[in-house]
């Protein structure tokens, strides 16, 4: 939550967007909104295939930070919280109801980004040059609740390569 991202302790399923010949935890995630990362996917109505994904949504973002949902399930999707009995998946009152967010982009402009305790504790490399007095650099972050979308087995499918390329382009812009 320090960066405005909330990752759920669940596995997302979506009976309304299953991938043929795959089990319930492999699904088509739809692009959400007009963010530059997903704009072309939304316009073309192309989904991204994810497998064993966790929910990833906007949490409490630090002041001056913007968080936008990139991918989500249909309204039929849910975040299954009973991870012990995944073979018998069924929606119950403990599950996160759909549409379930699956990816988020977070950014903060220069001078508004706030150093966090997490950032300060994880300085393993030599420190970067200090910004000018009172100035903080802009930063961007993309979090996807699934790493399989970018692996060899799924990367060539559907909108997966577009999502990956657009995310890198946005991060480097």
Language-model segments: residues:
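Acidic, S/T/G-rich, low-cysteine, solvent-exposed domains in lumenal/extracellular/periplasmic regions
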Residues: 1-173
């Amino acid at each position: 939550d320090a960066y405005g991202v909330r990752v759920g302790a669940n596995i997302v399923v979506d009976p309304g967007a299953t991938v043929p010949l795959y089990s319930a935890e492999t699904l088509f995630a739809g692009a959400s909104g007009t963010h530059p990362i997903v704009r072309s996917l939304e316009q073309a109505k192309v989904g991204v295939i994810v497998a064993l994904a966790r929910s990833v949504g906007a949490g409490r973002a630090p002041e001056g930070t913007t968080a936008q949902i990139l991918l989500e399930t249909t309204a039929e999707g849910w975040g299954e919280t009973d991870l012990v009995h995944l073979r018998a998946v069924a929606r119950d009152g403990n599950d996160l109801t759909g549409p379930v967010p699956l990816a988020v982009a977070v950014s903060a402009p220069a001078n508004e980004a706030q150093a966090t305790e997490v950032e300060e504790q994880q300085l393993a490399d030599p420190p970067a040059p200090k910004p000018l007095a009172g100035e903080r650099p802009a930063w961007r972050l993309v979090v996807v609740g699934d790493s399989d979308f970018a692996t060899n087995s799924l990367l060539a499918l559907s909108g997966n390569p577009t999502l990956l390329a657009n995310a890198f382009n946005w991060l480097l812009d």
